[in-house]
A protein has these predicted regions:
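Conserved catalytic-core segment of NTP-binding enzymes
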Residues: 132, 136-138, 143, 148-232, ...
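C-terminal lobe/tail of nucleotide-utilizing enzymes
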Residues: 1-4, 18-21, 192-346
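Walker A/P-loop phosphate-binding motif and the immediately C-terminal alpha-helix
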Residues: 27-64
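Nucleotide-state-sensitive switch-loop elements of NTP-binding domains
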Residues: 26-29, 52, 65-148, 152-153
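Residue-level signature of catalytic and energy-coupling elements of molecular machines
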Residues: 35, 107, 126, 147, ...
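Conserved beta-strand scaffold positions in the cores of enzyme catalytic domains, especially
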Residues: 28, 59, 104-106, 229-232
């Protein structure tokens, strides 16, 4: 939960002490992750969970796919900042800010038309427009979540880090190498701009971490890069079901275990004051680290635990069905017939 400095305690006429979360100032949090890793799912559920705590939340999707806030709005897409600007009409605040689940304010930066321009430019333009229109002063959000594509940390995608738009940065990652590779690149960007007012790192959100071996890999990567794990989020069919309905888990399955995972994560983010510079691995170090884990996994590839690991990656909760040894066939014994002896000739 938030520190006591973030709470206000008061006593109304009923004579009982009450407490509510009060943000001293707007919290700006950037959540990065490679495409398809679950950063938008995570961001939207965090936003929904924070809104349950009575906070005013704004989520800004910084991905050309423009689907960051879909599950906060029953699966519906909203006009993006770049689409609104391309229309040629004067852009009003109501054109780019749309209310979602439980009052969460939704914004999508958008991207260029296919084959034209720079995708990162949408983020630059969106943030500039929001500042010009004094959107943050008008709506006074307690928390702003920037959901940012993390495959590359360049140009517009690096703005939340480079210009200190966000005070804290998280990355969503699994134990897959390419997800960790993207996280390592993010760490390089944070380190590069740390001494010039850039955002600092606050933790890895380990997604799809159902098995001990998956956690071990992410934990070892965190130790190798001098970072920390903010929370583990298991893979769950509950997420899939809710997203097919166009909802977050917080809205679609509020009493589920998965919803509680997101609530715990949201509270941890709210109370987390850690801000530090990671120690990214260089190319050779990352290669050596990956090869060491490859050797470990190959050593145990024939074990039942490894088979279960492979199945779990496809079907959470699956159990390996090991082939039973076939019973040995006993060779058939041919019946022997007594030889007839030739009769002696008289």
């Amino acid at each position: 939960m938030p520190n006591i400095a973030d709470c206000r305690v008061y006593m109304p006429l009923d004579g009982r002490l009450h407490a509510e979360i009060v943000m001293a100032k707007q919290r700006n949090i950037a959540i990065y992750g490679k495409g398809g890793i679950g950063k938008s799912t995570t961001s939207s559920n965090i936003s929904a969970a924070l809104s349950e705590l009575g906070l005013k939340v704004m989520q800004i999707g910084c991905d050309p796919k423009s689907d960051s806030t879909n599950t906060l709005r029953k699966g519906r897409f909203i006009p993006t900042v770049l689409d609104s600007l391309r229309s040629g009409k004067r852009v009003e605040t109501k054109d780019i800010i749309h209310e979602g689940f439980n009052g969460v304010l939704c914004v999508e930066a958008g991207g260029p038309e296919p084959g034209v321009g720079c995708a990162g430019r949408g983020i630059i333009t969106a943030i500039e427009l929001l500042r010009q229109r004094k959107v943050f002063e008008e709506f006074k959000p307690d928390v702003v979540i920037y959901d940012v594509l993390g495959d590359v940390v360049c140009g517009g995608f690096g703005i939340p880090i480079r210009e200190g738009v966000a005070e804290q940065v998280y990355t969503v990652s699994s134990s897959d190498f390419m997800a960790l590779y993207a996280a390592n690149n993010l760490f390089k960007g944070i380190k590069k701009y740390a001494n010039s007012g850039g955002a600092l790192f606050s933790g890895i959100i380990a997604n799809s971490s159902n098995l001990p071996i998956q956690r071990e890999i992410v934990e070892d990567f965190a130790a190798s890069t001098k970072t920390t794990i903010a929370e583990y989020v298991p893979r769950s069919l509950t997420v899939t079901k809710c997203e097919l309905q166009g909802k977050t888990v917080i809205e679609g399955a509020p009493d589920s275990e998965q919803a509680d995972v997101y609530r715990i994560l949201a509270k941890k983010i709210l109370s987390n004051k850690d801000r530090y510079v990671p120690a990214p691995l260089d190319t050779d170090q990352l290669k050596d680290w990956a090869e060491s884990w490859s050797d470990k996994l190959l050593e145990g590839r024939d074990s039942p635990a490894h088979v279960k690991c492979e199945l779990e990656c496809i079907i959470p909760g699956a159990e390996p069905i090991l082939a039973k040894p076939r019973p040995q066939k006993t060779p058939a014994v041919k019946a022997t017939t007594p030889r007839r002896t030739a009769k002696a000739k008289g």
